[in-house]
């Protein structure tokens, strides 16, 4: 594949780069990895049953490595457009610090390592879901959907929604309605989150030909879709309470967070088309990250509280 270099310092295939450990760590997309690790850990905590702490740690490390591997493969394939977009031009490959072939090998080795170790140490169901997640993100989303359809992140968002299901499967060796709800919370959250970003990064996406919804369908359609997905996310966020694997108290917290999420999305909907500052979109993007962390934190706190009460007979 062709890699564009804005700095004239492209590291060519076949040549050893002078990459640092920090460059390879950046290749793993640590910010994305942190969200993956957090939601996978939530799946471990929320699942009924017990997993040995050592196996739990191994599971989380394998999921983190698998997420990092898919990030490396994504950066390898997207290096040509990363070089053009302002927010990605300084990534290791387009900046010439890591050769594309090194990034590809790094991602493939980590992918295989994470899946095999998770299967051998924990169970093969969780390893299979992890393998499918890596494939879905690196191949289905990155190589196919991202550059071919404005629904790229709607379908591709499934890759980011699997971690809590993997964590759940590590404990139970099963996929259940409860773990599917955890999947759906992230799956439905993804469009509003990324389309908010796409609104204030429209020019970048247009420059590289990635058909994000605002560029293809326009701002107004995108804003309608953001509100719709925010509502769906808020509704799905309270389902754990209705399905009985979270308390009424959690439901109130989730409802409040969902109401704020919807409010922020409506602020984006009311934003005039062509607004250059895009402040409501930036606020929604920031709050959406907080929302996801807050919902899964509330679920874990609720679960730990119920375990405490069941073991002690009450708070006092």
Swiss-Prot record:
The keyword Ligase does not apply. GO terms for cellular component: plasma membrane. Its main location: membrane. It catalyses: heme b + (2E,6E)-farnesyl diphosphate + H2O = Fe(II)-heme o + diphosphate. CDD domains: PT_UbiA_Cox10. Keywords: Cell inner membrane, Cell membrane, Heme biosynthesis, Membrane, Transferase, Transmembrane, Transmembrane helix. It comes from the Bacteria. The chain crosses the membrane at residues 32-52, 53-73, 93-113, 116-136, 152-172, 180-200, 221-241, 252-271, 289-309. It holds the Pfam family UbiA. GO terms for molecular function: protoheme IX farnesyltransferase activity. Its EC number is 2.5.1.141. It is a multi-pass membrane protein. It is an enzyme of class 2 (transferase). Pathway: Porphyrin-containing compound metabolism; heme O biosynthesis; heme O from protoheme: step 1/1. GO terms for biological process: heme O biosynthetic process. The keyword Membrane applies. It is found in: Cell inner membrane. Belongs to the UbiA prenyltransferase family. Protoheme IX farnesyltransferase subfamily. Converts heme B (protoheme IX) to heme O by substitution of the vinyl group on carbon 2 of heme B porphyrin ring with a hydroxyethyl farnesyl side group. Carbon 2 of the heme B porphyrin ring is defined according to the Fischer nomenclature. This is Protoheme IX farnesyltransferase. It comes from Rhizobium leguminosarum bv. trifolii (strain WSM2304).
């Amino acid at each position: 594949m062709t890699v564009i270099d804005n700095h004239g310092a492209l590291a060519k295939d076949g040549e050893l780069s002078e990459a640092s450990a920090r460059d390879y760590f950046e290749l793993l997309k640590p910010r994305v990895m942190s969200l993956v690790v957090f939601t996978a850990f939530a799946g471990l905590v929320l699942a009924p049953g017990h997993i040995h702490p050592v196996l739990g740690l191994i599971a989380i490390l394998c999921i983190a490595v698998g997420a990092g591997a898919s990030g490396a493969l994504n950066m390898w394939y997207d290096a040509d457009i990363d070089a053009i977009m302002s927010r990605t031009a300084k990534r290791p490959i387009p900046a010439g610090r890591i050769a594309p072939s090194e990034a590809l090998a790094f991602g493939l080795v980590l992918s295989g390592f994470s899946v095999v170790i998770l299967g051998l140490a924990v169970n093969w169901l969780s390893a299979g879901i992890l393998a499918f997640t890596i494939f879905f993100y690196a191949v289905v989303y990155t190589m196919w959907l991202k550059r071919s359809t404005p629904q790229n992140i709607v379908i591709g968002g499934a890759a980011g929604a699997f971690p809590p299901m993997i964590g759940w499967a590590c404990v139970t060796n099963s996929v259940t309605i409860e773990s599917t709800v955890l999947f759906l919370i992230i799956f439905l959250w993804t469009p509003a989150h990324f389309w908010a970003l796409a609104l204030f990064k429209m020019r970048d996406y247009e420059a590289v030909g990635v058909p994000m919804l605002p560029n293809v369908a326009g701002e107004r359609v995108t804003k309608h879709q953001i509100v719709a997905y925010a509502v769906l996310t808020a509704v799905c966020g309270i389902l754990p309470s209705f399905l009985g694997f979270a308390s009424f108290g959690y439901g109130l917290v989730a409802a409040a967070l969902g109401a704020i999420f919807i409010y922020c999305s409506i602020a984006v909907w009311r934003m005039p088309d062509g607004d250059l500052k895009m402040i409501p979109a930036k606020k929604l993007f920031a709050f959406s990250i907080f929302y996801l962390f807050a919902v899964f934190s509330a679920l874990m706190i609720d679960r730990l509280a119920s375990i405490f009460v069941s073991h002690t007979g009450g708070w006092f």
